[in-house]
């Protein structure tokens, strides 16, 4: 490798620029995920080739297949990274809630964190909502699995807030997650993430939707 600093060998083989083989592989993986986020959001999954992703990431095609089995595998890994980030934000926000916090206000604050996780970086929203429907059969299964997990997280939040939860709470939670996703996806068609008024309008819509959905929690 021209210009690389080789520092000798360690447990992971020779070190290049201070990184062993596993660390370099992890770096390539993140570079490919970053490139996929950029290209999938700009031109869509179907119109993006592995060669374009490799060029964007400055990674050789051979190295790509050392990390991912194909474009679909990369796409699913990108969705997983987004889920981990969103989950981290929501978990931190949930942990920060006070014990005497008003349940409705706390839920709205969590929804705001949920929306911000997607609209703070419009690329994340485009990949999640613009490419999230039936890109491939496996991607659709993946999407459904993530939504079920998100609904379970919502149920955990309701329990944490001490809200009365009916036996059909999981169905209500699934409807809430699906609705939140669709509201954000629809807003992205015309909304501008850089305009405070547009983001305030999105939050107001999400708040109203949550008010309607949560009204069904205590019904039998």
Task: Kindly give the residue locations of the regions a language model identified.
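C-terminal peripheral helix-coil segments that are non-catalytic and often amphipathic
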Residues: 1-15, 116, 151-159, 174, ...
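Helix-turn-helix
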Residues: 31, 39-73, 77
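Generic hydrophobic, amphipathic alpha-helix propensity
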Residues: 24-36, 53, 78-90
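Secondary-structure edge/capping motif, primarily at the C-terminal ends of alpha-helices
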Residues: 90-97, 128-132, 160, 187-191
């Amino acid at each position: 490798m021209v210009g690389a600093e080789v520092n000798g060998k360690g447990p992971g083989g020779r070190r290049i620029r201070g990184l062993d083989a596993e660390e370099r592989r992890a770096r390539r993986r993140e570079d490919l995920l970053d490139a996929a986020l950029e290209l999938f959001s700009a031109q869509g999954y179907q119109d993006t080739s592995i060669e374009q992703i490799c060029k964007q990431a400055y990674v050789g095609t051979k190295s790509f297949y050392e990390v991912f089995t194909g474009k679909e595998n990369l796409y699913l890994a990108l969705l997983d990274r987004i889920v981990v980030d969103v989950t981290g934000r929501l978990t931190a926000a949930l942990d920060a809630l006070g014990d005497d916090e008003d349940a409705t206000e706390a839920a709205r604050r969590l929804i705001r964190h949920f929306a911000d996780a997607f609209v703070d970086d419009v690329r994340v929203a485009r990949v999640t909502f613009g490419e999230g429907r039936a890109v491939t059969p496996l991607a659709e299964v993946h999407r459904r699995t993530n939504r079920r997990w998100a609904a379970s997280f919502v149920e955990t939040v309701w329990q944490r807030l001490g809200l009365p939860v009916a036996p059909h709470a999981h169905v209500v939670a699934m409807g809430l997650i699906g609705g939140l996703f669709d509201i954000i996806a629809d807003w992205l068609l015309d909304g501008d993430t850089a305009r405070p008024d547009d983001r305030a309008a999105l939050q107001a819509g999400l708040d109203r939707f949550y008010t309607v959905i949560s009204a069904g929690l205590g019904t039998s």
